[in-house]
Design a protein with these regions (language model features):
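Glycine-rich phosphate-binding loops of nucleotide-dependent enzymes
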Residues: 2-259
Length: 259
């Protein structure tokens, strides 16, 4: 593994009552790569994303983004350090236009001082122009520029997922977390998503994603970490992970035991 880690987690633990959802997980993600997190249902994948993004704090451990400790920071402060994320459930404003959805996301990450608020004028216009430009660039990258003026609820399901990625991109992140981005997509739609992730990587954005579509994971990932029962049981390149006996047991052994 080359490159300094832009995301570094050590001993991340999360409990829900008597259930240990994450059990001392370590993870290093080098800058600029596509890193997948896979594992059987209930293995702790989304819980780890929640801990990294601040959506749900871990009980113990250390998490760093670009060298800055973010353990127990609020999500908006983590976002300002350059991390954005999407969720399993689509979170868009259906009655707003596609462009307005992305502009709202971009505006949430614009810092304004009291002086900026009081003395608006040209500075405010410049900010609004910048937000619009960033929003349109994000839509262009995900292939939704032609739907900018349509209501978000009019988009097909897969396009709404791409809109979520555009909203996350509008904050100009260094790291993007994607939670099951291909859920509910057919093969053609998944290929479009794969191309979009490739474009994000080409822009230097580090991608960390959870996904059940193994073919997509193997096709786009530089590295894969595998969780099972809250523990990291394997990590490596796609070919290394595919051959790992612990991974084979986690996916196939459990299936045979419950058949």
């Amino acid at each position: 593994m080359t490159g300094a880690p832009i995301v570094s987690a050590r001993g991340v633990t999360r409990r829900f009552g008597g259930l240990v959802a994450l059990d001392g997980v370590d993870l290093d993600v080098p800058s600029g790569i596509v890193q997948a997190i896979i594992g059987p249902n209930g293995s702790g994948k989304t819980t780890l994303l929640n801990a990294l993004s601040g959506a749900s704090h871990a009980d113990a451990g250390s998490i760093r983004i670009g060298g800055a400790e973010i353990f127990r920071l609020k999500p908006h402060r983590i976002a300002r350090l350059g991390l954005s994320r999407t969720f399993q459930n689509i979170r868009i404003f259906g009655d707003l236009s596609v462009l307005e959805n992305v502009k709202v996301a971009a505006a949430c990450h614009v810092r304004s001082s009291l002086f900026d608020i009081v003395v608006a004028g040209a500075r405010q216009q410049a900010t609004e122009s910048d937000i619009e430009e960033r929003a349109r660039q994000a839509l262009d990258l995900v292939g939704l520029a032609h739907r900018a003026d349509d209501r978000a609820r009019e988009l097909a399901y897969a396009q709404q997922r791409l809109l979520e990625i555009a909203r996350a991109l509008a904050s100009e992140p260094k790291v993007m977390l994607l939670d099951e981005p291909a859920a509910g997509m057919n093969t053609a739609e998944s290929m479009t998503l794969l191309e979009t992730i490739g474009k994000l990587k080409a822009r230097g954005i580090t991608i960390l994603f959870v996904e059940h579509n193994v073919r997509l994971v193997m096709g786009i990932s530089d590295r894969i970490a595998v969780l099972d029962f809250g523990k990291k049981i394997a990590e490596g390149t796609p070919s290394e992970v595919q051959r790992n006996p612990l991974v084979i047991e986690a996916y196939l052994g459990r299936r045979h035991r419950h058949a």
